[in-house]
Amino acid sequence: MSAANMPTTTGAQGSGNQVPTTSTTIVNHFRELIKDPKNLDEASNYLFQTLLDDAVVGIFNETHHLRKSGNLAALDGVPEDSTYRMCEMPNLDIFGISTAKKPMDCTCPNCDRLVAAARFAPHLEKCMGMGRISSRIASRRLATKEGATSAHLHSAGNTGGTDDEDDVDWSSDKRRKKSNQNSRNNGSKKNNGKSF
């Protein structure tokens, strides 16, 4: 038997009618050829040729499938970056990022002024009237308005009264207690002038 007459895998012959050769059929055919010592050279050539054909056809089929599905670039994998380049320009670090400090300015949405980033929150609070001082002023305004409206109601002869007027004023007791404690000390220190 010559190498041309040896059965090969379906991929090697190119016909789609044959059943694909499995490894067990290859091994069985190889054992038949080895039984006769004269055919040993033929058997080794047959085994080598079928294994080589199988490998080549497998790679060809995989590459063809990747090309048709548009994934051939995935076969190469992710390209590696070029060797680590260091940037040696002034005011840049080794990665090419600027090392100079940039002044961060923010624009106030209320008054459209440029404000330093560190001062933006306090500025915005004051600009929008949300600060502590603005809060106190607003509380005073409300208190004076309420005082004016309640005086207006009393002067109009409203005898029904409101719920607030009927309630006991609990905060006045606290004020009275504070003033009593302050008068007991008569301005002296807590330790009554004793030094340790």
UniProtKB/Swiss-Prot annotation:
<dbReference type="GO" id="GO:0071819">
    <property type="term" value="C:DUBm complex"/>
</dbReference>
<keyword id="KW-0509">mRNA transport</keyword>
<dbReference type="GO" id="GO:0045893">
    <property type="term" value="P:positive regulation of DNA-templated transcription"/>
</dbReference>
<dbReference type="InterPro" id="IPR013246">
    <property type="entry name" value="SAGA_su_Sgf11"/>
</dbReference>
<feature type="zinc finger region" description="SGF11-type">
    <location>
        <begin position="106"/>
        <end position="127"/>
    </location>
</feature>
<dbReference type="GO" id="GO:0006325">
    <property type="term" value="P:chromatin organization"/>
</dbReference>
<keyword id="KW-0963">Cytoplasm</keyword>
<keyword id="KW-0156">Chromatin regulator</keyword>
<comment type="subunit">
    <text>Component of some SAGA transcription coactivator-HAT complexes, at least composed of Ada2b, not/nonstop, Pcaf/Gcn5, Sgf11 and Spt3. Within the SAGA complex, Sgf11, e(y)2, and not/nonstop form an additional subcomplex of SAGA called the DUB module (deubiquitination module). Interacts directly with not/nonstop. Interacts with the AMEX complex component xmas-2. Interacts with Cbp80; important for promoter recruitment of Sgf11 that is not associated with the DUB module.</text>
</comment>
<keyword id="KW-0863">Zinc-finger</keyword>
<keyword id="KW-0813">Transport</keyword>
<keyword id="KW-0479">Metal-binding</keyword>
<keyword id="KW-0862">Zinc</keyword>
<keyword id="KW-0010">Activator</keyword>
<keyword id="KW-0804">Transcription</keyword>
<dbReference type="GO" id="GO:0005643">
    <property type="term" value="C:nuclear pore"/>
</dbReference>
<feature type="region of interest" description="Disordered">
    <location>
        <begin position="1"/>
        <end position="22"/>
    </location>
</feature>
<keyword id="KW-0597">Phosphoprotein</keyword>
<dbReference type="GO" id="GO:0006406">
    <property type="term" value="P:mRNA export from nucleus"/>
</dbReference>
<keyword id="KW-0811">Translocation</keyword>
<dbReference type="GO" id="GO:0015031">
    <property type="term" value="P:protein transport"/>
</dbReference>
<keyword id="KW-0653">Protein transport</keyword>
<protein>
    <recommendedName>
        <fullName>SAGA-associated factor 11 homolog</fullName>
    </recommendedName>
</protein>
<keyword id="KW-0805">Transcription regulation</keyword>
<comment type="function">
    <text>Component of the transcription regulatory histone acetylation (HAT) complex SAGA, a multiprotein complex that activates transcription by remodeling chromatin and mediating histone acetylation and deubiquitination. Within the SAGA complex, participates in a subcomplex that specifically deubiquitinates histone H2B. The SAGA complex is recruited to specific gene promoters by activators, where it is required for transcription. Required for nuclear receptor-mediated transactivation. Binds independently on SAGA to promoters in an RNA-dependent manner.</text>
</comment>
<dbReference type="GO" id="GO:0005737">
    <property type="term" value="C:cytoplasm"/>
</dbReference>
<dbReference type="GO" id="GO:0000124">
    <property type="term" value="C:SAGA complex"/>
</dbReference>
<dbReference type="GO" id="GO:0005654">
    <property type="term" value="C:nucleoplasm"/>
</dbReference>
<dbReference type="GO" id="GO:0003713">
    <property type="term" value="F:transcription coactivator activity"/>
</dbReference>
<comment type="similarity">
    <text>Belongs to the SGF11 family.</text>
</comment>
<feature type="modified residue" description="Phosphoserine">
    <location>
        <position position="172"/>
    </location>
</feature>
<dbReference type="InterPro" id="IPR051078">
    <property type="entry name" value="SGF11"/>
</dbReference>
<dbReference type="GO" id="GO:0008270">
    <property type="term" value="F:zinc ion binding"/>
</dbReference>
<dbReference type="Pfam" id="PF08209">
    <property type="entry name" value="Sgf11"/>
</dbReference>
<feature type="region of interest" description="Disordered">
    <location>
        <begin position="144"/>
        <end position="196"/>
    </location>
</feature>
<feature type="compositionally biased region" description="Low complexity">
    <location>
        <begin position="180"/>
        <end position="196"/>
    </location>
</feature>
<keyword id="KW-0539">Nucleus</keyword>
<dbReference type="GO" id="GO:0006357">
    <property type="term" value="P:regulation of transcription by RNA polymerase II"/>
</dbReference>
